[in-house]
Amino acid sequence: MSLLLTIAKEYKRLCQDAKAAQMMTVGTVSNYTTFKKWTTSRKEKNPSLRMRWAMSSKFPIIANKRMLEEAQIPKEHNNVALWEDTEDVSKRDHVLASASCINYWNFCGPCVNNSEVIKEVYKSRFGRLERRKEIMWKELRFTLVDRQRRRVDTQPVEQRLRTGEIKDLQMWTLFEDEAPLASKFILDNYGLVKEMRSKFANKPLNKEVVAHMLEKQFNPESRFLPVFGAIRPERMELIHALGGETWIQEANTAGISNVDQRKNDIRAVCRKVCLAANASIMNAKSKLVEYIKSTSMRIGETERKLEELILETDDVSPEVTLCKSALGGQLGKTLSFGPMLLKKISGSGVKVKDTVYIQGVRAVQFEYWSEQEEFYGEYKSATALFSRKERSLEWITIGGGINEDRKRLLAMCMIFCRDGDYFKDAPATITMADLSTKLGREIPYQYVMMNWIQKSEDNLEALLYSRGIVETNPGKMGSSMGIDGSKRAIKSLRAVTIQSGKIDMPESKEKIHLELSDNLEAFDSSGRIVATILDLPSDKKVTFQDVSFQHPDLAVLRDEKTAITKGYEALIKRLGTGDNDIPSLIAKKDYLSLYNLPEVKLMAPLIRPNRKGVYSRVARKLVSTQVTTGHYSLHELIKVLPFTYFAPKQGMFEGRLFFSNDSFVEPGVNNNVFSWSKADSSKIYCHGIAIRVPLVVGDEHMDTSLALLEGFSVCENDPRAPMVTRQDLIDVGFGQKVRLFVGQGSVRTFKRTASQRAASSDVNKNVKKIKMSN
């Protein structure tokens, strides 16, 4: 009795609180799970069983009453209760509902067309489906397939970004207020951030979905796969269907017929070879021709020369135009100005020189055109028609494109027409150092301005302000362009109009013959410059997986693994008897020439940048110490030689010499990157590929004939004998002794025994003498 009285008193006390009274009088007191959840903090032992038990009740879930009424979901459908007008005890304005309520909303609720949103979210998957539809399947062959496991891209992307760069882009696109400080990538690609913001603005997508879309758009999804043949992303995404260990399914994948992708590939390769040729101080034009003719690309299953692809393509980008002019090709009446494509429509200008002052002191000349001309311009998604006369942009009409592209297109047109106050007095932030390249070549003032607007958004807007700001005519609202590139601005730029659709490029069947100057400037027969090396966009880190760069200067352009292998192969070929070969340089202790061999220089870009000085100090010390003591192995010297190019620097050494792709070699220890065996010192294995070490003296196909030489025999070691090369042996007299590098770099003493003597008859005797001299 006392227990019941205690409960009654507690109940009366709780009822003094309105919310508690409502819960105990209106709520489902019989619902054990509700009170169990509120009165215990222990972990559920069997959550799956508890969930099934809870869902077996009549109304296991809650729903927003207002949303149910707006969606016109009835309380009952086909004699099945969907929800009841009983307020839930745990959440205000929510009522109890059954699982059938969800089924009714899915099948009988209001229709919502989300097809466009779904296509946008899963764009990469739909793109893969479309590419599979384009595949041309051929015959199935049964044969042994030589597959190699490599890191490949399994998804084609328009622009490849690193994982950290994608995260920065996601933060700056979706969470501007919470984003960290701008990294170098954000500062250099802020236009991309604005483009992504405008792309996903006012779309019914939550931020998690947009983050997923951004990752799929820029992530090529690299994986380690056993591959064979061409390793283009379009082919790698279905490599499982193209072959196995004993069969090959012939097919033409979508990458072969994808004209835009092929054009981008050719453009990227041309950009690389142009920049490599420009880095050459002398004969840049001849170097460019050499690079083009020594390069080939794999198109599908076919290996084609880059020279043929350049002459066939209709691409008018500056890099392709430079390569085409180097080959003496023809082009339509087009020209390039930075990343902007231009095509003249009418008019013929006359060059006139004028002067602009840098920091108010130094006068710099630039050229402009005095007569009126009309042009078509194109930059990314924006197009334009404009007219120039004297030093002004008379008018311009911009079609299509996002705000950022329209702004940059207008800025480049202003610079091309020499429009604005900055062609009278240069911006204060432009210094004398901006007027020349690192090699000391002069940069024309218009390209100095192009570089200036790329440095910051403030510089770009400062140039646009120099165009002039006027009040927008109410009748032209929607067709005038504001300073931010928008259509509906209260104040707009002078003589700049916008139309919604793109402007079509005018066609021209007339072709012009191109020539290339030593400064890598393409010009036509009238002397008009149509493209220069300064028009090329900033170099991008691109790995060419299906391009063959045969020229030794371009070894670094291969994928890094192949470049390391080819670099070591080139060093091993220097194990000859020439004066400039590695054994001779070691004998003369000419370390400076050894560290600056062309093959060593070509491998220098493959070394980890932040450790190159420390690695150089360690590698040089290893080489000099071994040579000084006389106990060295040419194999080990070859291993560390690529790390000796840079100036030595003090620092902590962790025992391994790393390349930029995180692979490494370790002095005195074999690994997958570089290995060799004393049992068979005629081969060096680099990334599993056997490279034969050239034999300095004797038949390259006979390991037992290392010391055999026609007319000579091995004798006891005589340090007084002169060191000679193989080319000088013809001058050695009868009975004279000389020293020569043999085998893998060992020094042996030889004696002239006859003018002509068959080396094959002395095999056993000479080999025995070599062993005795050891």
Swiss-Prot record:
CC per GO annotation: host cell nucleus; virion component
Record GO biological process: 7-methylguanosine mRNA capping; cap snatching; DNA-templated transcription; symbiont-mediated suppression of host gene expression; symbiont-mediated suppression of host mRNA transcription via inhibition of RNA polymerase II activity; viral RNA genome replication
Keyword Hydrolase included in the entry's annotation: no
Gene Ontology MF term list: RNA binding; RNA-directed RNA polymerase activity
Spans traversing the lipid bilayer: none
Residues spanning the signal sequence: none
Localization terms from the record: Virion; Host nucleus
Coiled-coil segments on the chain, per record: none
Keywords assigned by UniProt, alphabetized: Cap snatching, Eukaryotic host gene expression shutoff by virus, Eukaryotic host transcription shutoff by virus, Host gene expression shutoff by virus, Host nucleus, Host-virus interaction, Inhibition of host RNA polymerase II by virus, mRNA capping, mRNA processing, Viral transcription, Virion
Subunit organization: Influenza RNA polymerase is composed of three subunits: PB1, PB2 and PA. Interacts (via N-terminus) with PB1 (via C-terminus). Interacts with nucleoprotein NP (via N-terminus). Interacts with host ANP32A (via C-terminus); this interaction promotes viral RNA synthesis.
HAMAP family noted in UniProt: INV_PB2
Function: Plays an essential role in transcription initiation and cap-stealing mechanism, in which cellular capped pre-mRNAs are used to generate primers for viral transcription. Recognizes and binds a wide range of cap structures of target pre-RNAs which are subsequently cleaved after 10-13 nucleotides by the viral protein PA. Plays a role in the initiation of the viral genome replication and modulates the activity of the ribonucleoprotein (RNP) complex.
UniProt family annotation: Belongs to the influenza viruses PB2 family.
Protein name from the UniProt record: Polymerase basic protein 2
